């Protein structure tokens, strides 16, 4: 059974994406005492390789010192788990110092970009594109691998060709997410797409992917293909979420997680 630990340093986020309903503006940043408690608990829990993913909100809000100390603590005290690390961030707070640290631990980065500037900023807010691209360039300068999640909404799905070409022309790997009905909006379906629309999008991207095979990676399609050939899924079977009590949100619950809160 796959062993995956998701660490949520904060559910706050400096961006204000139109379709996002998982942010908590009052969320505090996780302290090192919480990290130490997590490590102590995990020392008694399992004895097999583990992946630790930092998620949010925006995990970089925790700052450089948090990651310096947390990565060192996990690597040393949980070395028997052969820990690997990953992070999901909008890259706004990426610095050279942070990138050097992540490179030291070979941490792959997942970020979020919905296509060209005009499409992206319409959905995610003015200035989002430029700030994410600035962080992207810092990460690349330090040799970090960055992949992007692109959220397709009722607006952007009509411009799927522009979005695909943007990622193709810029040499960026892509993972697509369908916008889901909001749990907080008075109009929950405003940005959401239907299952039928998502299916049509996958078929379009499969055709485009095959046409440009080897030039771009679309993770969803790769995972479908690997699952078919290997006859086993690539999804997480067991996920432990470590957060402060206020951070168990619908976004976290949605993952079919086994949640361990402090």
From Swiss-Prot:
Stated name of the protein: Uncharacterized protein MTH_114
Keywords carried by this UniProt record: 4Fe-4S, Iron, Iron-sulfur, Metal-binding, S-adenosyl-L-methionine
Binding positions ([4Fe-4S] cluster): 13, 17, 20
Highest taxon above the source species: Archaea
A Gene Ontology molecular function term of the record: 4 iron, 4 sulfur cluster binding
Matching SUPFAM superfamilies: Radical SAM enzymes (SSF102114)
Radical SAM core domain segment(s): 1-211
Alphabetized Gene3D superfamilies for the sequence: Aldolase class I
Co-factor requirement: [4Fe-4S] cluster
Organism expressing this protein natively: Methanothermobacter thermautotrophicus (strain ATCC 29096 / DSM 1053 / JCM 10044 / NBRC 100330 / Delta H) (Methanobacterium thermoautotrophicum)
Family according to the record: Belongs to the radical SAM superfamily. Anaerobic sulfatase-maturating enzyme family.
């Amino acid at each position: 059974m796959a062993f995956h630990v998701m660490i949520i340093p904060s559910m706050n986020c400096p961006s204000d994406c139109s379709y996002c309903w998982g942010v908590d503006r009052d969320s505090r940043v996780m302290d090192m005492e919480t990290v130490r408690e997590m490590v102590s608990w995990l020392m008694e829990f399992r004895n097999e390789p583990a992946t630790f993913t930092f998620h949010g909100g925006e995990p970089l809000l925790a700052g450089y010192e948090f990651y310096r100390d947390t990565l060192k603590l996990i690597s040393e005290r949980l070395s028997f788990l052969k820990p690997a690390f990953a992070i999901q961030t909008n890259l706004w707070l990426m610095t050279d110092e942070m990138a050097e640290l992540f490179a030291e631990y070979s941490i792959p980065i997942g970020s979020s970009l919905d296509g060209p500037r005009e499409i992206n900023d319409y959905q995610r807010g003015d200035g989002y594109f430029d700030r994410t691209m600035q962080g992207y360039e810092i990460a690349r300068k330090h040799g970090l691998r960055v992949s992007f999640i692109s959220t397709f909404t009722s607006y952007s799905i009509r411009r799927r060709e522009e979005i695909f070409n943007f990622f193709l022309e810029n040499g960026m790997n892509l993972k697509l997410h369908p916008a889901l009905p909001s749990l907080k909006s008075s109009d929950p379906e405003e940005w959401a797409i239907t299952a039928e629309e998502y299916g049509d999008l996958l078929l379009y991207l499969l055709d485009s992917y095959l046409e440009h095979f080897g030039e771009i990676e679309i993770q969803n399609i790769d995972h479908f293909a690997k699952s078919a050939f290997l006859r086993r899924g690539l999804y997480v079977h067991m996920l432990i979420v470590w957060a402060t009590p206020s951070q168990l949100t619908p976004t976290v619950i949605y993952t079919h997680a086994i949640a361990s809160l402090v």
